[in-house]
Amino acid sequence: RKVIGVEIVEEAVEAAKENAALNGLDNCEFIAGDVLKVIDDIEEKPDYIILDPPRDGIHPKALEKIIRYGVDRMIYISCKPTSLARDLEVLTARGYQVERMCCVDMFPWSGNIETVCMLSKKD
């Protein structure tokens, strides 16, 4: 098994590499770049996808490419409910269903929440 992480912030990629090394993980590859541009270079079909896009959600072209992988399950983490709703509308129209959803208060005493959705491919 292999973990591939794509992150636009270079410092976050370096931190992920350092964290993987500190934990003795040698099956991780972290790529710095925009997922829309990098996704075409990832030829292996993932078993599972975890999405944590910026506030505006996933670029529609990137979302289409992610859907084409046809994974059975994915996690979508969102910090903006309207972006999540827009992307979930596309995902559900393309054969995914929301299995579970919960809100996580990552920023106490603020008006912000993270929403975590577990999606699965409809049979």
Residue spans of the language-model regions?
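Rossmann-like S-adenosyl-L-methionine
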Residues: 1-123
